[in-house]
């Protein structure tokens, strides 16, 4: 999470960004939202586009928990088949069984992304930038991509009308 300050409320001139890499897939209630972000400035600007409805409904499995219901990367493969949703949206895949033991989370079976870089500073209390980068390749099917990376950077400004700059940079190598 990166922010321009700590004032709260709808009238506050603070910008806040939440950047998520989401390394492990714990299945069940887990969403396919690795590499997503949410932005807030005088109100909610970006993030999830779905209202979490009833568990187990088509909306729950085909939208709310899927990449398409967030602002993740959709990489469409016309030959892809889904065993989880009624439609193929190009989002991340679910291939992990339910987690039964905590130790199993340490295996590659449950890895959907890896943080490959993060930094903020130089002042840890009032940083000039916040950066995170992740390898999202494990979250997509092997026959679709050989590399998927997303990097995000947040930089506060001194401008009250535009209190921050937020960059999202993607690298996708398809097969």
How does the language model describe each region?
Residues 1-175:
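Catalytic and substrate-binding regions of extracellular carbohydrate-active enzymes
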């Amino acid at each position: 999470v990166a922010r321009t300050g700590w004032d709260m409320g709808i009238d506050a001139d603070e910008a806040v960004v939440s950047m998520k890499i989401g390394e492990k897939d714990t299945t069940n209630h887990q969403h396919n939202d690795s590499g997503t972000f949410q932005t807030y400035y005088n109100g909610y600007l970006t993030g999830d586009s779905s209202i979490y409805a009833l568990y187990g409904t088509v909306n729950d499995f085909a939208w709310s928990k899927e990449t398409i219901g967030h602002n993740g990367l959709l990489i469409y493969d016309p030959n892809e088949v889904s065993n989880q949703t009624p439609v193929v949206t190009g989002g991340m895949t679910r291939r992990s069984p339910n987690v039964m033991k905590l130790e199993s989370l340490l295996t590659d079976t449950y890895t959907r992304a890896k943080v490959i870089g993060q930094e903020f500073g130089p002042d840890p209390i009032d940083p000039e930038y916040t950066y995170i980068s992740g390898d999202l390749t494990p979250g997509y099917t092997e026959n679709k991509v050989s590399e998927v990376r997303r990097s995000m950077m947040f930089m506060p400004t001194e401008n009250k009308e535009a209190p921050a700059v937020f960059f999202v940079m993607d690298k996708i190598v398809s097969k």
